[in-house]
Amino acid sequence: MLLSIVTGLNESKSRNEVIIKKFNDLCELLKPLHYDGIELSLLEPEKIEVRKILEVADSYAMKIPALGTGATYVRFGFSLGDMEETIRKKAIDRIEKYIEFARETESKVIIGLIRGRYKSDNSPKKEILNIIASLKECCWIAQNNNVELVFEPINQFEIDSYNTISQALELLKDVGSDNLKLLIDSYHIYLEEDPGFVWEDLEEIAHLVRHLHLADTTRRAPGTGHFDFKSFLEIFKKKGYNGFCSIETIMKPSFEEVARESSQYLRLIL
């Protein structure tokens, strides 16, 4: 398994030379800590000069395993499930920008918060249908660009739809696209899944998983809470998973400290 960590580049407010320097500094920090890649949480990927980012990544033998898209919903309010067709179209257009970036960086594109929250108690069924229809369109765009999308079940306190593994499996069936797979996050698993059955459930769906997010029960660095990462990761290792495990936590006391602490802990069990 490979290790990465989530961060942003503040590309919306920075010149390209500043963005490239920030990425270089991240690689310089993370490579000695035995990281294999950096997962980028972006808002406007089209503002980044991909060729230069790749030059830096290659010089450190680092990958960009996945792109986070949630900022599109948080900042702009665009979502795949919105009741307004114009808003859904804007969300799909934004996803296309991520896909174009991912095509060059060989990254996966994450479908998480961008599916949005329900606008009212009367709209859930319609918004679920909107999410499915929007995702079918996104999958078609991704397939034409040879990019894989990964869908993340997220806990009910952060989003209204598809909180559990079983619900995410239903979505995959409803969308019916070979290039839509799963992202499993240890923190959301801890909050949403039945602890008596979660390991069995993970074994059953491991073949559909293409990316992992790691955070402990406190949403801090792995090893600071009581989540059983050894058992969690062993399931995927046994199933032949050789992709990325990406640290996605509250970055306190600092990004550097979380990166160091997480690597020291996880390298003992990866």
Mark where each language-model region is.
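Conserved beta-strand positions in the central sheet of alpha/beta enzyme cores
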Residues: 39, 66-68, 110-111, 150, ...
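Generic structural signal for helix capping and beta-alpha/helix-loop junctions
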Residues: 47, 74-75, 119, 152, ...
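N-terminal pre-domain/capping segments
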Residues: 1-103, 177, 181, 207, ...
